[in-house]
Amino acid sequence: AFVGWLVHDATRPPRRPYLVTPEKFELLSHRGLRVTEETWTNRDGTPARGWLLRGDEGAPAVVILHRYGADRSWFLNFGVKLNEATNFTVLWPDLRGHGLQPPVEWSSFGSRETDDALSAVEYVRSLRTPAGRPLVADSLGLYGVELGAYAALTSAAREPRARSLVLDSVPASPDDQLLAVVRANTGLDNPLVSFLARAGTRVYFLGGYNNASACAAARALGERHVLLLAGADAPHLRDSTEALSRCFEPATNVEVQTGLALTGFTLGTAPGEQGELYDRRAIDFFDRTLRATH
């Protein structure tokens, strides 16, 4: 019974009201936003949803993937600023199990989220202008934090058009993500609980749990642009991100900044000035690297 509770609780992320919605954001900022609610289908047939802000025809797109326990609203402000600075198309999915009344009730700690990220990329690449032409350029960017960073990295290893990645506080594997959630939920950090959580999760997913390492995905990237971010607000993820930085092959252009006072892990609740500095760092990277490949 303990193992069943442990796994069930971990696979159901906490759900809270959105920090902000596009409608509230428009009222507060007096911007004429064109953010729309969109739906598509994941590769396993489950439904997916996200907010979409269309950019200029022929400009790149960026898909923004939040961390475990957060939701798309944490990065609405960041994505709007990215669109305003670059005219890129921006898509904010809710990862499975996240957001209000999620269409899929459970998270898989990155195992299924890799395919979900690929489905989001396929969706944004399917967008058309009113004249029927492709909306977005061939190259695109992926931004992710923690669980979202793992999904961004592992999906990019299978999607060569993902040319630019901003990866913040990256767990080493789905097991690493799972055990962090179990520690947070129970306050327990010992080998027995870790063993039970890992074994129970594999039984729960009936053989459909893939514990692929982030390092293996990094080695497979080839010629891409990657910005790795981490900081003191998530020290265990700073360690795994620094370890990840040593996995990339020489062909991958990697920039590493792991001494940040603020990361995307706490960005949704960060004070304004710190958040502005963080946003500018990521926006400038996407602007510089995606325009170079566009």
Indicate residue ranges for each PLM-predicted region.
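Hydrolase active-site cap/lid region
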Residues: 154-207
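Alpha/beta-hydrolase fold nucleophile elbow
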Residues: 132-146
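Serine-hydrolase catalytic core
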Residues: 27, 40, 48-51, 199-293
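An N-terminal hydrophobic leader/cap segment in hydrolases
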Residues: 1-40
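Conserved alpha/beta-hydrolase
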Residues: 82-103
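Alpha/beta-hydrolase active-site loop
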Residues: 107-134
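Short beta-strand element of the alpha/beta-hydrolase
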Residues: 59-67
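The serine-hydrolase catalytic nucleophile loop
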Residues: 68-82
